[in-house]
């Protein structure tokens, strides 16, 4: 699942001849447009004046290694971005005597999620900076001496770029915790795909017979601290986004002496990219539906403080091969946690989809909206908006090229669709639409209906649901939160730090008010005070770290049997199999809960009225909801984490 960048010898090796009429149609200069049967494309004024024109590759390349953050802003992109021809690569690799080469990624038929982690080779780790804006880099597209005729052929995905390892064998723990024995619970089946860091297999859960995908990441290939941190962060982000219907779900992470095993949902419907290839382009109605899904994931990510940084059709998989199959976002290997107004400088992504501010090394989550805009353009027309024969040429077009709305099929596409694409591909990120604004655009709305009000941020939504729970359930969630691994709550920890402005370990009313405002929540002070009091279980007047985690925890954590049993066991002090009023009173005292109204809590949960709570009654309370003032539905459509309200 992955297609790599093609180097300067692209014309000589015949790759450009393997284009398809349905996809990536080459555009020509203005002087040739009249004689073309397709009438394809406009080029920038600079490109039109040059004697030779750029040709487009037959499909977008895989993410590439881009310039380091220390590159002189005045230096052109080409020296950092140009990929050596194969024979030159081998010569370079031979000279690196102490380095290993990770095998190239191969094409796979139905990859549930590739281990195709793109690596930014640079002296510094990929950390955001808040320095003054650097000067834009200048690039010149390369030109060919002649335009070769196109021939119809099945497009082949180029092989992944080779990754040259540094040195050394890493033996310490990657997950930083002891895990259960993977082989006791799962057996591996056929190979689904090969990535840079590991291999993806079909995976069978022994206890249930359920099928999953398992990405086994070889520890010996994690040769730098950055490699290890990338793996940890990817797992953390997948846990953080868990529960969204269009994000691939993670079942668990395991580690043994040789590998990290990441067990995930199995998606067997193939890539969005492949369906675009088959169709040429989508109808507007279907394209709008897919755009809603893609941008909906973005809105969810951004509200949870996550920037994807590598959106492209290859990173979306269908659950099945059915026409109306659910679409899932995969591969968070380049994703990062971010804070409001944080500036990132490391250049990562894929050439056709990278935002101009990323190339200028000063960007934030707005760059994801640009990438989504490129995908929408491709869904509607079958070709990318900015293209050239070389990577350098692509970047020049991204920075300065003009959008083409004159070539087929754009004359037959609605003005509303064109308006959305224009607003998503504004080069100034401050003027670009946000993910939520895209969802409110008339072309994307469901049956022409926009949300009545801005979507609640994930933090606000979860706190609202938490505030509606009775104190017994709040305490149980606190127990579950304290039992979770660091990787499962790392995202919430980042959000707590963002709101806790003075780093006191306590969130005050003013800090909560400011934090909710930063993520787009517009609440009255009385409403914020209600949320504050609901989360402040021990009535201390502030929200401490553990209270915040419990109040913002996604309720999918309740579905796990081990979490439920651990919480029940905490209250069942004498291990009798029942929770008595005295045991519940003791727990309230431990949590500092005053005015607990023990009898009322018992009455709400004790279904058989025997004066005690058994395990089944406890599970029913946790899963169905037992809330002061009425029942609450806890399906995906009402999950207040990151589901979208229509």
Curated annotation (Swiss-Prot):
Residues 186-444 form the Protein kinase domain. Residues 27-169 are annotated as: Disordered. It is found in: Endoplasmic reticulum membrane. A lipid is attached at residue 5 (S-palmitoyl cysteine). Residues 450-480 are annotated as: Autoinhibitory domain. One of its GO terms (cellular component) is endoplasmic reticulum membrane. GO terms for molecular function: ATP binding; calcium ion binding; protein serine kinase activity; protein serine/threonine kinase activity. The active site is at 310 (proton acceptor). Its main location: endoplasmic reticulum. Ca(2+) 4 binds at residues 606, 608, 610, 612, 617. InterPro entries: CDPK_Ser/Thr_kinases, EF-hand-dom_pair, EF_Hand_1_Ca_BS, EF_hand_dom, Kinase-like_dom_sf, Prot_kinase_dom, Protein_kinase_ATP_BS, Ser/Thr_kinase_AS. The modification Phosphoserine is found at residue 350. ATP binds at residues 192-200, 215. It is a lipid-anchor. Residues 487-522, 523-558, 559-592, 593-628 form the EF-hand domain. Ca(2+) 3 binds at residues 572, 574, 576, 583. It catalyses: L-seryl-[protein] + ATP = O-phospho-L-seryl-[protein] + ADP + H(+); L-threonyl-[protein] + ATP = O-phospho-L-threonyl-[protein] + ADP + H(+). Ca(2+) 2 binds at residues 536, 538, 540, 542, 547. Its EC number is 2.7.11.1. Pfam families: EF-hand_7 (PF13499), Pkinase (PF00069). Interacts with 14-3-3 proteins. Belongs to the protein kinase superfamily. Ser/Thr protein kinase family. CDPK subfamily. May play a role in signal transduction pathways that involve calcium as a second messenger. This is Calcium-dependent protein kinase 2. It comes from Arabidopsis thaliana.
């Amino acid at each position: 699942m992955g297609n790599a960048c093609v180097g300067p010898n692209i014309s000589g090796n015949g790759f450009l001849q393997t284009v398809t009429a349905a996809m990536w149609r080459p555009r020509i200069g203005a002087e040739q447009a009249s004689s073309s049967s397709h009438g394809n494309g406009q080029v920038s004024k600079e490109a039109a004046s040059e004697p030779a024109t750029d040709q487009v590759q037959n499909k977008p390349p895989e993410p590439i290694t881009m310039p380091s953050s220390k590159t002189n802003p005045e230096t052109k992109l080409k020296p950092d971005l140009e990929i050596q021809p194969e024979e030159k690569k081998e010569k370079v690799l031979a000279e690196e005597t102490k380095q290993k080469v990770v095998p190239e990624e191969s094409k796979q038929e139905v990859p549930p999620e590739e281990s195709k982690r793109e690596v930014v080779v640079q002296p510094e780790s990929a950390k955001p900076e808040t320095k003054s804006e650097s000067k834009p880099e200048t690039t010149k597209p390369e030109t060919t001496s002649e335009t070769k005729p196109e021939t119809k052929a099945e497009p082949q995905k180029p092989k992944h770029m080779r990754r040259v390892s540094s040195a050394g064998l890493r033996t310490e723990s990657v997950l930083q915790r002891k895990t259960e024995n993977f082989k006791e619970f799962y057996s591996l089946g056929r190979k689904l795909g090969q990535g840079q860091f590991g291999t993806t297999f079909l995976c069978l859960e022994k206890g249930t017979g359920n099928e999953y995908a398992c990405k086994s990441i070889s520890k010996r290939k994690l040769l730098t601290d950055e490699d290890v941190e990338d793996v940890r962060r990817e797992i953390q982000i997948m846990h953080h986004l868990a529960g969204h219907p269009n994000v691939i779900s993670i079942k668990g992470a395991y580690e043994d002496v040789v590998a990290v095993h990441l067990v995930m949902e199995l998606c067997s419907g193939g890539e969005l990219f492949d369906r675009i290839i088959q169709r040429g382009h989508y109808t507007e109605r279907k394209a709008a539906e897919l755009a809603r899904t893609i941008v909906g994931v973005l809105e969810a990510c951004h509200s949870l403080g996550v920037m994807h940084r590598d959106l492209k059709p290859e990173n979306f998989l269908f659950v099945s091969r059915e026409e109306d199959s659910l679409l899932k976002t995969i591969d968070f290997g380049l994703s990062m946690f971010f804070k409001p107004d944080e500036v990132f400088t490391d250049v990562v992504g894929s050439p056709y989809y990278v935002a101009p501010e990323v190339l200028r090394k000063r960007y934030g989550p707005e760059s994801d909206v640009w990438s989504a805009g490129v995908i929408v353009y491709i869904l509607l027309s079958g070709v990318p908006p900015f293209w050239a024969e070389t990577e350098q040429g692509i970047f020049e077009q991204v920075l300065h090229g003009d959008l083409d709305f004159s070539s087929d099929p754009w004359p037959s596409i609605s003005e509303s669709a064109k308006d959305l694409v224009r607003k998503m591909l504004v080069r100034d990120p401050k003027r670009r639409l946000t993910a939520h604004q895209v969802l409110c655009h008339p072309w994307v709305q469901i049956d022409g209906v926009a949300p009545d009000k801005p979507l609640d941020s994930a933090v606000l939504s979860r706190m609202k649901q938490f505030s509606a729970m009775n104190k017994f359930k709040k305490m149980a969630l606190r127990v579950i939160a304290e039992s979770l691994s660091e990787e499962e709550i790392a995202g919430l920890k980042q959000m707590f730090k963002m709101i806790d402005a003075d780093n006191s370990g306590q969130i005050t009313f003013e800090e909560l008010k400011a934090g909710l405002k930063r993520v787009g929540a517009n609440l009255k002070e009385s409403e914020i005070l209600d949320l504050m009091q609901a989360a402040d279980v021990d009535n201390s007047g502030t929200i401490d770290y553990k209270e915040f985690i419990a109040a913002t925890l996604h309720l999918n954590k309740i579905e796990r049997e081990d979490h439920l049993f651990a919480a029940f066991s905490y209250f069942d002090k004498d291990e009798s199999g029942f929770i008595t009023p005295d045991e519940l009173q003791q727990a309230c005292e431990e949590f500092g809960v005053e005015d607990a109204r023990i009898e009322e809590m018992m009455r709400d949960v004790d279904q058989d009225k025997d004066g005690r709570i058994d395990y089944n009654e406890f599970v029913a309370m946790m899963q169905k909801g037992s809330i002061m003032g009425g029942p609450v539905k806890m399906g995906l459509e009402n999950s207040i984490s990151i589901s979208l309200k229509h």
